[in-house]
Structure formats: C-alpha cells, structure tokens
Amino acid sequence: MTLVAITYTRGSLHILNQLLLPHQTTYDPLHSARDAWHAIHEMRVRGAPAIAIVAALSLAVELHTLATNNQLSAEPKDVELLILEKLEFLVSSRPTAVNLAEAAGRLGRIVNGRAQVQGVGGNEVAEAYIEAAERMLEDDVRDNRAIGESGAKWVLEHAITTKGSMSGTGQAKVAVLTHCNTGSLATAGYGTALGVIRSLHATGSLERAYCTETRPYNQGSRLTAFELVHDNIPATLITDNMAAALLARQSAGPAQSVGVSAIIVGADRVAANGDTANKIGTYGLAVLAKYHGVKFLVAAPRTTIDMNTKTGADIVIEERPEKEVTKIRGPRVGEEGNGLGAMETITVAADGIGVWNPAFDVTPAALVDGIITEVGVVEKDGSGVFHLERIF
C-alpha cells in the first residue's frame, strides 16, 4: 500500500508535513487558501502535481466553509472575483511549477462559465469550483498509474541491458536511477517517475532503484528513500556526486548486479520544445546519461507541459534561501546512531560565504530520450524534435 500524503473529504483537507519526514508522520490541517500558500511556500508539501491539488482543494475547503456559514455573496460575479483573487494568490507561492498556474487557469474558466449562466447564485458558482477541484484529485491518481504503466513498458522495450537477472516471466530486469521525489508525496498518489519504478517493481521487472540524496533539501534521502522502504522496493541511496561513478560501474556487488539502464525524473515544467525544468541536479544527470549511453526519461502529466513556454530559456527559476544550503535540520541521535531526539538545526558551511541556491535547472530537450505522459511516451522525430502538441 503506497503512502497517502493528501487526505480530503468535502470541507476537510490534511497534508502530510514533509519537513518532518522521515522521522515524524504528522498531518497538518489546511482550512484556507492562505494556509495552503504557507504550506506550499514552506515546502511542507511539494512536487508540482501535489501543490496544484493542495492549492485547489484548500480553496474548495474555504468556499465550503463560507457557504455552510452563509458567508458567500448571493451574486455570482462576487464569488467569481473572490475565487480568481485567491487563485492568483496561490499561484504566487511557487512560480516555477506550471501545474499550479495551469490548474488555476482551468478552474478560473470553469468558474467564469458558471457565473455567466442565467439565474445562478453565488453558492452554485462555489459548488462548481469545489466539484472541479475534487475531480483534479481523482484524475491525478488515474493519470499517475497510466504514466507508470507506459513508462515501465517503454523502459523494458528500449532500455534493457544484457547483464542481470530475469523476472519470473523470463523478462530481463532493470535498474533505474531517480532524482528528487516524484512519488505519492509529490502527487495525489502513486507518482510519476517513482510511479514508473513502482510499476516495474509490481511486474517483477525491477532489479533495483537508486535514488539521489538531492541536496540541498534532501528530498531523495528524506522522501524518496522513505517511500521505497515503505513499499519494500529494493533500493539504494547515493549522494548526488556519486551518480557518475554509479553509471560507470558495470557491477556494484552481489546484491546490485545490474548496471543502470535508465534515469527517470519528474518535471516542474516542460516547455513546448521539450526543455525540462526540474529539481536542481537534473541537468547534470542528463549529461552523465548521454555520456554513458543510459536512457534519460522525463515522467510528467500533460498538465506539466506548458505549450505557451516555447523553450527552457523562458522558464522562471525559483531561488531559495541561503540557509537551505548552509544549515541542515534533523533529530539528535546517539554516537552509535541509535535513538531519535529533539529536532535540531546545525550549520554546515563557513560563516560569511556567499550562496547561490536555485531550486531548479533546465535540461535541454536534446538530452531527453522520451517524455512519459498519461497518454503514452513521446519521442523525438528523426530530426531530434519533440512534437508535444500532438498529445493535446
């Protein structure tokens, strides 16, 4: 059973506080759009699909509360304006991920259409919004499973290495490297890149998953490793600067006998030409994959593809606080590594050093072998060009 990071019933929304993982499992209630803005900005919830869903549902909860308490205007245009203002506010929480802006635009159009219907009141406009936001939650889980199945099939057909063990069906097994966190903690459930790994594991086709630590926020060691252990998927954690050595090795010991066949990552925004903004460090992995002849795949729902952004040069890259690089937070442990004490923050850098901390980098489309979506895997044509418009 996979982790559940978002729990929702009408009028109630809770998120798993990812800042406390893997040491504490705490669900935070969100009652309003403002609550969600802070949760997203503070990265208590993260991952492009997840933040869009949490943002949308937080406003659904707020509208439900207002309607229940008879605090919504009876005028449809007033409610529409309220919703649009709050959606705009939510989009400002993290600017790079396109899913949030895409969801806000889509929900805004639904609200606008409902508000223009003759005889409709304010509560009915709010109801239209709530129903649309709830569908987003259902659709994301369905889409993630489709991404997982499509990606697993493509990997087994295109990225098999000759070395390694066989599954029970005689299919060669694969080892996959992933970066950051793209699983149940980053989506409504199952995951995108991690969903592909889950699908490979479910069919007995996965030899081993490798996950990077993903500095400076350690989403790999804190979150992806947590999910892999939770699901009993055979996995190994590496630091970010070990990836080249891993790809160069033909064998990593008796328990890890398959060379990496594919690197699969998620995305926060994919430009129309296939350039991909994702967690910092993704670009470097793509360069390594090209050198070592390893398939490099991006797994993302179509809502992550921004056809209005022509190339990666047009993507705004969020920069995070210096303290995320110079300090690290975790529980105190004994000298033998046993026991979990109070959470503490320690410094790991020289005082006074300058820090550059971009949250994302952009991987050129030329380094991407395929983009895994819920409707299949998009590959480049003979000229090396993605035609992403064909999947819409």
Curated annotation (Swiss-Prot):
Signal peptide: none
Catalytic activity: 5-(methylsulfanyl)-alpha-D-ribose 1-phosphate = 5-(methylsulfanyl)-D-ribulose 1-phosphate
EC number: 5.3.1.23
One cellular-component annotation, GO: cytoplasm
Swiss-Prot/TrEMBL site (Transition state stabilizer) positions: C180
Alphabetized UniProt keyword annotations: Amino-acid biosynthesis, Cytoplasm, Isomerase, Methionine biosynthesis, Nucleus
Domain of life per record: Eukaryota
Enzyme category, top tier: isomerase
Keyword Isomerase belongs to the record: yes
SUPFAM superfamilies: NagB/RpiA/CoA transferase-like
Pathway connected to this protein: Amino-acid biosynthesis; L-methionine biosynthesis via salvage pathway; L-methionine from S-methyl-5-thio-alpha-D-ribose 1-phosphate: step 1/6
GO MF annotation terms: S-methyl-5-thioribose-1-phosphate isomerase activity
Subcellular location: Cytoplasm; Nucleus
Xref: NCBIfam families: eIF-2B_rel, PRK05720.1, salvage_mtnA
Recorded family membership: Belongs to the eIF-2B alpha/beta/delta subunits family. MtnA subfamily.
Matching PANTHER family: METHYLTHIORIBOSE-1-PHOSPHATE ISOMERASE
Summary of the function given for this chain in its UniProt record: Catalyzes the interconversion of methylthioribose-1-phosphate (MTR-1-P) into methylthioribulose-1-phosphate (MTRu-1-P).
Protein name from the UniProt record: Methylthioribose-1-phosphate isomerase
Species annotation: Ajellomyces capsulatus (strain G186AR / H82 / ATCC MYA-2454 / RMSCC 2432)
Lineage of origin: Eukaryota, Fungi, Dikarya, Ascomycota, Pezizomycotina
Gene, per the UniProt record: MRI1
